[in-house]
Amino acid sequence: MKLQQNCDLELRLFPTSYDSDSSDTTSVVESTSSGNPQPNEESQRITIFYNGKMCFSSDVTHLQARSIISIASREMKTKSSSNGSDPPNKSTSFHHNQLPNPKASMKKSLQSFLQKRKIRIQATSPYHSRR
């Protein structure tokens, strides 16, 4: 069984060149408490990002982590081969087109905050007085 070549399993690092351009892609990141691999530990914590969801597990053995990474790499290879060549990063172009005007966004946020604050104040006042 051959694992993904650009994934260093000994350091448990996932390559930084991976583009997560769709919500149904899989990526795996394993983290330890100190950041350095600890060979004495039987199991370690792992964080899995799958289909737009984040899952945590604190009892994953080294063999299980390798299996998860292997399955994820096979799924990514299958999806990339079915799409042909790698598509451009859609998420960055989407975010650039969807960024609102910062001033308008701040104004809308402030108005929403003030409205909610007004409602909270009215709800907590003993006589529900209107101002």
Swiss-Prot record:
Q: Which InterPro entries match?
A: CCT_CS, TIFY/JAZ, Tify_dom
Q: Where is the protein localized?
A: Nucleus
BP GO annotations: defense response
Q: Where is the composition biased (Polar residues)?
A: 79-100, 122-131
Alphabetically sorted, this entry's keywords are:
Acetylation, Jasmonic acid signaling pathway, Nucleus, Plant defense, Transcription, Transcription regulation, Ubl conjugation
Q: Where is this motif: EAR?
A: 9-13
Give the result of R12A, as annotated: Decreased transcriptional repression activity
Q: Does the keyword Transcription apply?
A: yes
Question: What is stated as this protein's family in its record?
Answer: Belongs to the TIFY/JAZ family.
PANTHER family in the cross-refs: PROTEIN TIFY 4A-RELATED-RELATED, PROTEIN TIFY 5A
Subunit (UniProt): Interacts with TPL and weakly with COI1, but not with AFPH2/NINJA. Interacts with MYC2, MYB21, MYB24, TIFY10A/JAZ1, TIFY10B/JAZ2, TIFY6B/JAZ3, TIFY6A/JAZ4, TIFY11A/JAZ5, TIFY11B/JAZ6, TIFY7/JAZ9, TIFY9/JAZ10 and TIFY3B/JAZ12. Interacts with RHD6 and RSL1. (Microbial infection) Interacts with the pathogenic Pseudomonas syringae HopZ1a protein.
Q: Please give the function described in this protein's UniProt entry.
A: Repressor of jasmonate responses. Unable to associate strongly with COI1 in the presence of jasmonoyl-isoleucine (JA-Ile) and is therefore more resistant to JA-mediated-degradation than other TIFY/JAZ proteins. Repress gene expression through direct recruitment of the corepressor TOPLESS to cognate transcription factors. Interacts with and suppresses RHD6 and RSL1 transcription factor activities to negatively regulate jasmonate-stimulated root hair development.
Protein name, entry field: Protein TIFY 5A
Could you tell me which species this protein originates from?
Arabidopsis thaliana (Mouse-ear cress)
Q: Which gene underlies this protein?
A: TIFY5A
